[in-house]
Amino acid sequence: MLCLPVFIILLLLASPAAPKSLETRIQNDLIRAGLTDADLKTEKGFLSGLLNVAGSVCCKVDTSCCSNQ
């Protein structure tokens, strides 16, 4: 009879701990995956955007740097 309250208390103490650790692992994985995706998107998008802006500014200032000629 004494084991039942002890078991219930231990169950209540242990059960909230499991979802938090799983939740934390999932959040860490999502953060890492998001950073990896962000790095790939940033490199391609940012560098090509910079090259396009630099090319358009160069073509406006001096037409000898344009690749269209």
Swiss-Prot record:
Belongs to the conotoxin T superfamily. Residues 20-54 form a propeptide. It is found in: Secreted. Its main location: secreted. The cysteine framework is V (CC-CC). This is Conotoxin Lt5.7. The keyword Transmembrane does not apply. It comes from the Eukaryota. InterPro entries: T-conotoxin. It holds the Pfam family Chi-conotoxin. One of its GO terms (molecular function) is toxin activity.
